[in-house]
Structures are given as C-alpha cells and as structure tokens.
C-alpha cells in the first residue's frame, strides 16, 4: 500500500477514542478487515459523524498510520436505515456482523464476504414491518450462507454416521432426527441408538472376569458415538435442508417455534466453530420472548 489508499467498505464496529474520535472496524472489498480512526466523528456536525455509523457503506480514502490508519475522506454510497427502525432487524444484523468479524481476514480481498453480508442485510431491511419470525427465518438463512462461505457448512442432507440420505417424515408426528455439533450435522437416531447399545454391551462384557488372558488381542476401533445436541422434527429438518438454497423458502407463520429451533441449532454450531459466543444472540432471545408473550 501507498501512504494513502482507497477502499469500499461497510462499518461493522465502532468505539470511542479520546474526546471526539472513533475507531471504526470496516469490512472492505479490497483489503478485508481494517481498523481506522474517524477523526472528529463524535463532534456535532462532523462530516464523518453519520459516515462512521453502523452498517454504513462508504467509499474511503485512508491514510496509513504507524499503529492505526486514519480516514481522510468518506463518501456514503449505501445505508440501511430500516434496520435501526426495528429491534428484531437490528439485533439480527448485529448478530451477522459478529460472525463476519470472526470470519473476515485482514490485508486480503474479501469481496465475496462483503457482497454476501450486504445482500443479507438488504433482505432483512426489505422484510415487511411486523414479520418478527420472518426476521428469524432470514437470520437463519444468512448464518447458513456465512458458514458455507467459511467452509463450515453443517451436513443436513445425509446422516453423519451412515452417510445415507435423510428425508423428513411428515406422516409420523413422532418422527425425529438428531443433530450433533461435534459430528457436524444430522444423525439418524436409529443408527445412533444402535451404536450406543453396542457400546454398552461391550462395556458390560469387559467388566466380566476372564479366566485366561490370551497371548495377543485384536484391537477393534469402534465408531465414536457423537453427542446429540438437539432433536429435530420433520418440519425443522425440512427448513434446515432448504437453507442452502439462494432464496429462502416461503415463510409459514404457523411454524414460528420451528424457526426458533433452527436458529438455536445454527447458533450453537456457529459458536462451536468460531470458538466464542455470539453476544447479540441475547438480544434475539429477549426480542422473540417478548413477541411470543405479546401474542399469547
């Protein structure tokens, strides 16, 4: 880079610095994540005030610094005002920003991640007002796509144990499938139960006294039994399997609780692979708990 450089980026995080400045974390197409000072941006009528806000997309001219770069010019090309007008949309967008901050690299182009985030923020903003569980569905869709871009796609079409295709059984209301975070996706519960019983049987046999110890033993490595993180019904599995599509399935408001389950599964899966909690998820929990109470 020269002493100054140009970049197009979206603001994902801002924190106060000194009396009137901000440090802004920006996802840029050209250079990935950068942290730069927005000088005087907290002053009244500062030209950088609004341009350093969350989810504002700017064309930037940035001066290189010893420890932190400095924004010298910013021209706004896109904003998402609709996100701030709806608590659910705002919480969902902050949730996505946290994931992106964990995934994005510095000093490397991140055009695909930049475009994907902006696309899903646009979809969230365009949702009709009052569709609270639509927000949850669109959030789950975005999280799945971000995980896929990072190479962390959960296995939702075939069983992690048997490698056989699993399709939802909509006829049997008691039908369930397991989801194992450690195994990386869905698990046929019949196969899982068979492994568990086999392991219990072997454990009992080992505890019995053996009169003669053979000179040699055959070591058999059994398939590890994964922990089941959640159990999904047919509707929830169907939703999960459709999240890989470019467009989200038609939202059925009668399946509100199912979207809650799908989001919870993806949240736990993302946190496991990112190695940290998603703090904005607490806002999602509070928002949907309040909306559920209001409709009961």
UniProtKB/Swiss-Prot annotation:
GO term, biological process aspect, one: double-strand break repair
Keyword Disulfide bond: no
Lineage: superkingdom: Bacteria
One of the record's GO cellular component terms: bacterial nucleoid
Gene3D superfamilies to which the protein is assigned, alphabetical: Nucleic acid-binding proteins (2.40.50.140), Recombination protein O, C-terminal domain (1.20.1440.120)
Keyword DNA damage: yes
Keywords assigned: DNA damage, DNA recombination, DNA repair
Biological role stated in the UniProt entry: Involved in DNA repair and RecF pathway recombination.
PANTHER family to which the protein is assigned, alphabetical: DNA REPAIR PROTEIN RECO
Family to which the UniProt record says this protein belongs: Belongs to the RecO family.
Listed name of the protein: DNA repair protein RecO
């Amino acid at each position: 880079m020269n002493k100054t450089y140009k970049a197009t980026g979206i603001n994902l995080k801002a924190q106060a610095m000194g009396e009137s400045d901000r440090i802004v974390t920006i996802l840029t197409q050209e250079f990935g994540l950068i942290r730069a000072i927005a000088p005087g941006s907290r002053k009244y009528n500062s030209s950088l005030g609004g341009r350093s806000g969350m989810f504002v997309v700017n064309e930037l001219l940035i001066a290189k610094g010893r420890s932190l770069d400095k924004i010298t010019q910013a021209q706004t090309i896109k904003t998402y005002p609709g996100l701030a007008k709806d608590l659910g949309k705002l919480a969902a967008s902050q949730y996505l920003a946290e994931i992106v901050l964990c995934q994005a690299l510095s000093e490397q182009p991140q055009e695909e991640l930049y475009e994907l985030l902006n696309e899903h923020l646009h979809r969230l903003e365009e949702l009709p007002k009052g569709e609270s569980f639509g927000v949850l569905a669109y959030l789950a869709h975005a999280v799945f796509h971000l995980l896929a871009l990072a190479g962390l796609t959960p296995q939702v079409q075939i069983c992690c144990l048997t490698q056989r295709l699993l399709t939802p059984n909509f006829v049997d209301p008691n039908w369930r499938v397991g989801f194992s975070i450690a195994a990386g996706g869905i698990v046929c519960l019949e196969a899982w139960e068979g492994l568990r019983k086999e392991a219990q049987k072997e454990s009992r046999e080992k505890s019995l006294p053996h009169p003669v110890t053979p000179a040699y033993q055959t070591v058999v490595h059994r398939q590890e039994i994964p922990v089941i993180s959640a159990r999904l019904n047919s509707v929830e599995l169907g939703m999960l399997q459709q999240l890989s599509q470019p467009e989200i399935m038609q939202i059925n408001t009668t399946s509100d609780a199912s979207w809650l389950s799908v989001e919870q599964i993806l949240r736990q899966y993302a946190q496991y692979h990112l190695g940290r909690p998603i703090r904005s998820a607490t806002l999602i929990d509070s928002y949907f708990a309040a909306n559920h109470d209001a409709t009961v």
